[in-house]
Amino acid sequence: MALTVDVAGPAPWGFRITGGRDFHTPIMVTKVAERGKAKDADLRPGDIIVAINGESAEGMLHAEAQSKIRQSPSPLRLQLDRSQATSPGQTNGDSSLEVLATRFQGSVRTYTESQSSLRSSYSSPTSLSPRAGSPFSPPPSSSSLTGEAAISRSFQSLACSPGLPAADRLSYSGRPGSRQAGLGRAGDSAVLVLPPSPGPRSSRPSMDSEGGSLLLDEDSEVFKMLQENREGRAAPRQSSSFRLLQEALEAEERGGTPAFLPSSLSPQSSLPASRALATPPKLHTCEKCSTSIANQAVRIQEGRYRHPGCYTCADCGLNLKMRGHFWVGDELYCEKHARQRYSAPATLSSRA
């Protein structure tokens, strides 16, 4: 329906548009502001703008149409093409409840007739029953499961899921002639694994006669995935270094001979591997605190070791690990305090 609308100005006019030549759609009103000028002029969402102030809007770009509407003098004259179809939330002037009720009943009657025609087209039992092997086929009863294996819909979803979350709850228990995997939650179907048989095998699992149980072949992909998930969850192993350290600490607490713990700063043993493992040497003893060094040791001289925390200046307590030490008598000093005790630098012996 073609009509002309005059929107009183000035701008803004109170509506939005969409479409244009660049969108390959006609220019259409998409939103009208409440209590706006376009609302007062009876402009509605869904109206197609044919002309703006007498100029055809068929070949206009979206930005061009926006510019002409914004810069239009008052009043803004729009030639519209309004569809007769009623949009949701609008009645196109039909405010009578009887008219609306009649339209609603007519739409309901149309829907009912379409459903009846659909049911009549599928009235044949063969057309309604799904084909064998389809995912929508219902599982047969337990009495008819004699020749061909069947699988329930719940197990199909378990087998087709990529992550197999239910496989974490499977636990195997011994059984004569088969192994049974029971799900952790009560009410779930159990999975039975049959030993390989000499006859031809079916690619699908079968149902057990006890009811609700599924039979899996050991060569099936589902069973292999379940086995891989179980083997991948093995308990973490303790590292050999940590085990040696733990044994050394326990032996030291008991007052016995601690086991040998190799260190990056300790001298490497020249004994064969078999002899070194059989009779491990003692741990190094710190010459300052007279305790065993269980982890890292600082080698000062041949047969003299200290903890990294005990390798300090005898005067100021500065750690000498990254600085080196100076001997003054039988004590270790940093460079500053060693020079204070000896004025002649030639008498100092240093070790970097």
Swiss-Prot record:
Q: Where are the transmembrane segments?
A: none
Question: Could you tell me where this protein is found in the cell?
Answer: Cytoplasm; Nucleus
Supply the name of the protein.
PDZ and LIM domain protein 2
Short name of one Pfam family: LIM
Its source organism is Homo sapiens (Human)
Extract the ranges annotated as region (Disordered). Answer: 67-97, 111-149, 170-213
Q: Where is composition skewed (Low complexity) in this entry?
A: 111-135
Metal-binding among keywords: yes
Q: State what this protein does.
A: Probable adapter protein located at the actin cytoskeleton that promotes cell attachment. Necessary for the migratory capacity of epithelial cells. Overexpression enhances cell adhesion to collagen and fibronectin and suppresses anchorage independent growth. May contribute to tumor cell migratory capacity.
Q: What are the UniProt keywords, alphabetically?
A: Cytoplasm, Cytoskeleton, LIM domain, Metal-binding, Nucleus, Phosphoprotein, Zinc
Residue positions of the PTM Phosphoserine?
S124, S127, S129, S134, S137, S143, S161, S197, S203, S213, S266
Where it mainly occurs, coarsely classed, is cytoplasm
